[in-house]
Structures are given as C-alpha cells and as structure tokens.
C-alpha cells in the first residue's frame, strides 16, 4: 500500500519477522500481493466503504490467508485477532 501502513500490516510484518525469519521475505511478498489483489477487486466501492476496507478489512483478510501458509487456520485466526 502506498498510504501509511495499517496496524494490521505492521503487526503482520512483526509476526513473520519474529516467528518465521527464514520465510519473512516470502510471506511479506505474499501478503502484499494478496492485499493488492483485494484492493483491486474492491476498487469500485464507495469512498466510505473504501476507508474501512483499506484500513481494517482487507489487510486482515490478507494477513489471515498468508499466515495459513505457515500455521493452522485457527492459529492464524487467533493471531490476526490479537493484532
């Protein structure tokens, strides 16, 4: 994202750096690619909806989906909920 990084993005990057340092670059790239795809899919949303999508909803989805590459679904969900 070109805008200021969200707390979800920041916390995701911190999680992968601490828990999966050998795969951090790969996971950060996957997160960025998924987030950009989600943003593109929702480009037609109203400005009000865009704000919430960009700040919370879409980064949360991208973090959850990416973390599932390295941990069980429930653990990924709990990790994102902890952000």
Roles of regions detected by a PLM:
Residues 1-3, 48, 53:
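Generic cytosolic/nucleocytoplasmic N-terminal low-complexity/intrinsically disordered segments
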Residues 2-18:
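Short, charge-rich amphipathic alpha-helices with coiled-coil/heptad character
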Residues 39-51, 69-70:
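Charged, low-complexity interaction regions
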């Amino acid at each position: 994202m070109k805008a200021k990084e969200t707390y979800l993005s920041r916390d995701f990057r911190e999680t992968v750096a601490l828990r999966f340092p050998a795969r951090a670059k790969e996971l950060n790239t996957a997160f960025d690619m998924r987030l950009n795809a989600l943003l593109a899919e929702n480009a037609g949303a109203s400005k009000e909806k865009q704000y919430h999508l960009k700040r919370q909803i879409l980064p949360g989805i991208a973090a959850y989906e990416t973390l599932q590459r390295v941990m069980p679904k429930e653990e990924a969900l709990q990790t994102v909920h902890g952000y």
